[in-house]
Amino acid sequence: MRIFQGSYQEFDSIFIENNHIKMTIIPEIGGKIASIIYKPQAFEILFQPSEPYRMPIYGDSFEKYDTSGIDEMFPNIDISDYPYGISNMVTLKDHGELWSVPWGASIDRSRIITQVAGTELEYSFKRIVEVKNNQIFLDYVVTNNSKKSILGIWAFHGLLACDEMTQIFLPTDKVINVHDSSVLGKAETLHSFPVTKDLQARDYRLDRIGSPLLKKAEKYYVCGKLKTGQASLTLNKNQLLCKMNFNEKKIPYLGVWINEGGYKNQYNCALEPSTGYYDSIM
């Protein structure tokens, strides 16, 4: 295993690599994990941007930028006022404030440590990355640097390079649609998983991903809090099984994003463990 510095798409980057995995981190762009290559199959796991990266402007709209790879969402996702325990109301930015600011980075033997300080609220956010064989370990530490409690939510925002053979496996038989949908109906509709009924009472597979020609996107959450912190899906035409494991006591919610060309004309999906249900801290 080796860790080295270099350039990725014209940005200073840190690489961690062994016989199974090569990962690329761009500290300057919100600590983004830009690439994960599974070397035995020469397969890029993460959805890649179609245009060069641009340096984000703090407080700007998330969708104006690359929407690729893995970004950290904290302390919010939806734009929202923060009224809790502070004298002056502050507005939390779109998709949080971490993705649009440069992070610091250091190498500690076999680990990459990236960290950043909050802007609107007084906290520090640290992520520790380590690769062992064919596994990636992500550890997080959020430190409150103020004298008052800080409330917020964290979500893992990792866009994956899916295809029409991708299959999703979740530890549940019930999910909740969180977007109004021409297929799944109004937001907050309860559905069976993996097979439900669409608005025409036809069988609809929630565990599969359709063609990018469908020009639609769906998002749903596992119903209620997780009993088991795990989820997985197949990639690279069913040749690769990608598993996620996390502590369901600390991260009790799980969202699924399926983009079949409906958002920014892109084709990707995401498994999104989070500390709060959906995107609001209110």
Which residue ranges define each predicted feature?
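Surface-exposed acidic/polar loop and edge beta-strand patches at domain peripheries
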Residues: 1-137, 145-282
